């Protein structure tokens, strides 16, 4: 599979943003200008609106990290943070290795910002097969640094999160194919409830630049490799 160009990436950003009824404006539509909406001094949502979105799209589900630590999806991983999220599984031999290697490059480009200004999360789609040890070894193989956490949990909980953050198709046949859920990255600013997505095979420097727009809207971008 070829690495996607910027034109390809923008053309594929039709993946639906998270949205809840009357507060759908809280989520940035996936577009070329979406990140420009995250501006210094922007007002956070009301507590009521933020809670409403959280309850539908950011469930407080228990998970386990690659270190064996028990965490809650919303309270511990997402609340008050800038995050990126994707799905994979260890024995995937097609798209997953390419996307995960690309994310490793994104982390290198962002450097110490990951774990401080941005938190990266990768969830296994096969929690019955991928043990905590498997996640830890996979992470080590990729050379992942602090700030990039691999996660597992009960199969039904992983499925709940997958659907809640928008990695779900209405066609049950397509939705049941795990390879349909491993090619995209969901990213967002939780305090402002601004969310979008990008293809995991876009150029790593463009993904990093997009994430930096979310973190630091008016500072110099990462150096392209």
Where are these regions (language model features)?
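N-terminal secretory signal peptides and thylakoid transit peptides that target proteins
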Residues: 1-17
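N-proximal helix/coil linker or "cap" segments that precede and/or mark the start of modular domains
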Residues: 27-60
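A short beta-strand-turn-helix
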Residues: 62-82
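Structural microenvironment flanking redox-active thiols in thiol-disulfide oxidoreductases
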Residues: 98-161
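Short loop/turn microsegments at loop-to-beta-strand junctions
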Residues: 58-59, 83, 182-183
């Amino acid at each position: 599979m070829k690495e996607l160009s910027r034109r390809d990436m923008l053309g594929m950003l039709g993946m639906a943003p998270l949205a809840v009824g009357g507060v759908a404006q809280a989520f940035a539509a996936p577009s070329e200008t979406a990140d420009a909406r995250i501006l210094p001094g922007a007002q956070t949502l009301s507590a009521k609106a933020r809670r409403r979105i959280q309850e539908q799209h950011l469930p407080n589900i228990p998970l386990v990290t690659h270190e064996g630590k028990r965490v809650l999806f919303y309270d511990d991983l997402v609340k008050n943070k800038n995050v990126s999220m994707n799905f994979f599984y260890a024995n995937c031999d097609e798209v997953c290795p390419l996307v995960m290697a690309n994310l490793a490059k994104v982390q290198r480009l962002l450097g110490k910002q990951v774990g401080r200004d941005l938190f990266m999360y990768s969830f296994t789609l096969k929690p019955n097969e991928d043990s905590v040890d498997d996640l830890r070894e996979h992470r080590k193989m990729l050379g992942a640094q602090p700030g990039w956490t691999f996660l597992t949990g009960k199969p039904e909980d992983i499925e709940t999160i997958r659907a809640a953050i928008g990695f779900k198709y209405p066609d049950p046949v397509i939705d049941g194919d795990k390879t349909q859920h491993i090619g995209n990255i969901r990213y967002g600013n939780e305090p402002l409830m601004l969310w979008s997505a990008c293809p995991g095979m876009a150029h790593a420097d463009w993904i990093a630049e997009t994430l930096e727009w979310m973190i630091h809207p008016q500072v110099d971008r990462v150096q392209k490799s």
